[in-house]
Amino acid sequence: MHMLKAGAALTPALYLLSHLGVGNPGSSILQAILLLPLMGAVCLIFLPSSAQDTHKSIALLTSLITFVLSLFLWVLFDHHTPEFQFVTEFHTLMRTSGTPISFGVDGVSLLLILLTCVLVSICLLLGWDQGAMGESVSRDTKVSGLQTRGTGSGVTTLNNLKAYYVSLLVLQTLLIAVFTVLDLLLFYIFFEGVLVPMYFIIGIWGSRERKITAAYMFFLYTLFGSLFMLLAILMVYFQTGSTDIHTLYLSEISKSRQLILWLAFFFSFAVKVPMIPLHLWLPEAHVEAPTSGSVMLAGILLKLGAYGFLRYSIPVLPYASSYFAPMVWVLSVLAILYASLSCLRQIDLKKIVAYSSVAHMGFVTLGLFGNAPEGALFLMLSHGVVSSALFVCVGQLYERHKTRLLTYYGGIVQVMPVFSSIFFLFTLGNLSMPCTSNFVGEFMVLLHTYNTNKVCGTLAATGMVLGGGYSIWMYNRVVFGTRPKVEFISHFADLDRREFCSLLPLIFLLFWMGIYPQAFINVFHASVAHLCMPS
């Protein structure tokens, strides 16, 4: 019944989208993918706050339809050409020059759009039981004289529930726009616009008292870094007379100016990755964010910086990218080793996964500037799957036991065997076991890096070994042991059907990408080759 009401509420939006086409079915689909999440958010805003079941249905239905449409783009996509496809123009949104705003898809952006749609749908499914009677599904519990407040995803009031879904759908819209817009200035606007819904997700629905501080750190760190990019965009415009991506790819910028512009872009993108030493905001943001916030942060937002390097820094500023490549190698290796060693001394599960993300993104930046861009992009996608799944698993533990500290766990396999099995699969992915997706990406990066610089390749391989160490250590501390460390752990049930279904797509992707990576590499091979070897 609620799904029927949701469909009825979305009918005007779907009717409008059906009349946006310009003759090309791919362009029509791309327009729908861009606008449908935003229209779903608008529908939610005008619904009464008490209609919480309808809110959930509209949000999930909107996200699922967007995902299905993105699959149609994959089917229609021609992976043999590096050119942008399904180019669509919004003539009603005119820039000062009178040129319509253009959006398009290549092999790089297509897979990131698919990943975004998958993760948003999973986030909405994770929060499906939130908001009942104004509380989280994990309501206040008293066990062994210890009272704990159930926060779950932090959705505590009916108004907050609606705002939560609106924030996720707006975030999805902005992320898709970042990956498809064909203008540098608009890329910056959407790039920064992502901060707003993510700030609210962390600051309002975070799980602890320091969530406001974490939200401020996330917002200010990334905003300050992006100011350099704004100055660089102004310099590019005065140099080339345009911010259109096709014009930039054909422009010749002097070597001295390339060095300045590259550094400005670097600070902005490095904060988002994040690279050492600009990573301090990430562990704090992950620890305080709700599960859905951590999933989106690790799965997609960390990819924005690497995407910026691949989309703009390398093709537009090739000389500077080559000039500063050794510096990036050093910073990447430092990130891999430092973050991996930091994982071994953490006792908070979220911090372990957060520092693990810093290490894996170190492999990504190493590959981007170490002649392994395809491996770097593949690892970006894989990390989006594995890290998101690990944060979901940590969130499922937290919803039951109200703690993320390793010292309180042990013997979980006795009471949660299904969870322990799934957690084991993603632990294998995190330590880059063969036949999992991370192994393919990291092996490609290490192979090309070693051929480029043997010292960096060897040190990075050491980080891969450390990754296996902290992953096995974490899993052993949580799952095995003679009995649970805290008595009340034994009172909680294993995963329910909804929780299992939310992880099922990620399990499928983990092994599909690991066993048959060519299905994904074929999609972006031509595009990556074009970006890294501009004519």
Language-model segments: residues:
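Transmembrane helix-loop-helix hairpins at membrane boundaries of multipass inner-membrane proteins
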Residues: H2-I29, I45-V166
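Hydrophobic alpha-helical transmembrane segments of polytopic
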Residues: G7-A8, L30-L36, G40, H55-T62, ...
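Central hydrophobic cores of alpha-helical transmembrane segments in multi-pass inner-membrane proteins
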Residues: T11-Y15, Q31-P48, L60-V75, I113-Q130, ...
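Interfacial loop-to-helix junctions that mark the boundaries of transmembrane helices
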Residues: G21-I29, I101-S109, L185, Y249-K255, ...
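Functional transmembrane alpha-helices
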Residues: P37, D106, D183-I201, V271-P318, ...
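Transmembrane helix-loop junctions and nearby membrane-interface residues
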Residues: I45, S49-Q52, L71-T81, S121-G131, ...
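Alpha-helical multi-pass transmembrane bundles of energy-transducing inner-membrane proteins
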Residues: S50-H55, H80-E83, S138-K142, A163-R257, ...
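Juxtamembrane/interfacial segments at transmembrane-helix boundaries in multi-pass membrane proteins
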Residues: D78-P100, E135-V137, S207, K211-T213, ...
